[in-house]
Amino acid sequence: MFQFQKTLSLALTLTLGIFLATTSVTAQAQAAAGKTELLWLGQAGFKIKTPGGKTIVIDPWLTGGPKTPAPYKTDIAALGKVDLLLVTHAHVDHIGDAPAIAKAQNTVLYGPADMVTPLITLGILPANLGHRFNKTGHVTPLPGIKVTAVQAEHSSLLVHNNPATGKNESHPAGEAVGYIIQMENGFKIWHM
C-alpha cells in the first residue's frame, strides 16, 4: 500500500510539473506574440502601446500636471500618433489636454455622454471628434480592441473659460466612468 501511494504521489508530481512547464511555455509564447506597454503620464494619465502597435491615451493632463514626465509636459505632440483617446470625467486633472490632442491629431475623444455633449456645445471640441459613451456600454473603436465603460463613483464638473467674458464657467458634466480595455491578444486593463 505504501509503495502504491509513493508511486501515485510521484506520478501526480510529474504530471503537475509537466502541466506547469507547459503552462509557462504557453504564457511565454503568448507574451512573445505581443506585449502591452504602459507609460504613466502623471495623475491618472497613461499611454498604452498595444500588441498590435496602436497607441491609447487615457486622461491626458499633461501641460498642467505637476508629475508629467518630460517631454510631454511642454509638447503634447511628443505622444506621437494617438489612435484612441479616452477620458473618464471632466475634472481638469483628467480631461486636461484631451480636446487639444483630439483637434491636433483629428482623433476622436471618447468619454461619458454628459461630458462630451458640453464639450461640443461650448465649442471646445468639434462634433465629429466626440464620441459619447453610456455606462456599461462598449465599443470596438479599433480592430481587435474592445473598450467597455464601467461605473465609477466620482463627481464631474467641466470648468470652461468663456472667451466672450474672459471668466470661468462651471458646467455639470455627468457621472465619471472607468474603462476596461481589452487588447488584441485578450489582455485587459481596468482604468478607474
Language-model features: locations:
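Pre-active-site segment of Zn-dependent metallo-hydrolases
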Residues: 50-91, 96-103, 126, 156-172
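Active-site-proximal loop/helix segment associated with metal-binding centers of metalloenzymes
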Residues: 149-188
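Switch II (G3) loop of P-loop NTPases
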Residues: 61, 191-192
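Short active-site oxyanion
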Residues: 36-37, 103-108, 188-189
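Active-site beta-strand termini and strand-to-loop segments that position acidic
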Residues: 48-51, 141-143, 181-185
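Zn-dependent metallo-beta-lactamase
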Residues: 2-13, 17-55, 62-64, 146-154, ...
